[in-house]
Amino acid sequence: VLPAFGFSSTTMDNVIINTYPAILLIGYGNELRSDDGIGQRVSNLIASWKLANLYTLCVHQLTPELAEILVNFDVAIFVDAYPATVEQDVQVSPIELVDTSVTMGHSSNPSYLLGLTQALYGRSPQAWWVTVPGVNFELGETLSPVAEQKIEVALQEINHLLKTVDSDGEYKPKYHHLAFGSSGFCSNQQE
């Protein structure tokens, strides 16, 4: 159940004007597979910031049922881990909708979930995907030192993103664009 949208607003002549977009941050991944739990860890850390217009959600995987929640927000930020080398860094990329005519099953990726939200409700939030490198995806509940270090970078990037999103949910990223391979993993491409 979502809390009431009590984000910051100003009142002029008895008209309430929202000055901040409603933002949902979804951290996802399996906390029992070491670095795969990065997304949920980041979501929990950001929840402690207690920002009035920011809601956080931790899930094991992205499911179609999340579309019903996403439609209520202006901006969505998805946070997940990706298998990487020590040299790779946090990546922030705008997410484009995908065609939802192909069924993805019970779990999906952010692009498909946004496309589904658009198809079902006629709108979807502006969205970004924050991917954080991890090196250990074996069974376990402890994050690798690389993951711990990159989480700090992710928090800085998300903080910058939150400060840059305006009242319309618009943002002009200065980051690299991610291309999605057939394996479901991302490859970094310069724009």
Please annotate each region the language model reported.
Residues 1-11, 182-183, 187-190:
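N-terminal amphipathic/basic-hydrophobic helices that include classical n-h-c signal peptides
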Residues 13-14, 67, 117-119:
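A generic local secondary-structure boundary/capping motif
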Residues 16-25, 31-97:
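Nucleotide and nucleotide-moiety/phosphate-recognizing core
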Residues 28-32, 99-102, 139-142:
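A short glycine/serine-rich beta->alpha loop
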Residues 33, 37, 104-108, 145, ...:
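Residues at secondary-structure transition points
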Residues 56-59, 110, 151:
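A conditional alpha-helix N-cap/helix-loop micro-motif detector
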Residues 82-127:
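Helix-loop-strand module that forms the ligand-binding subsite of alpha/beta enzymes
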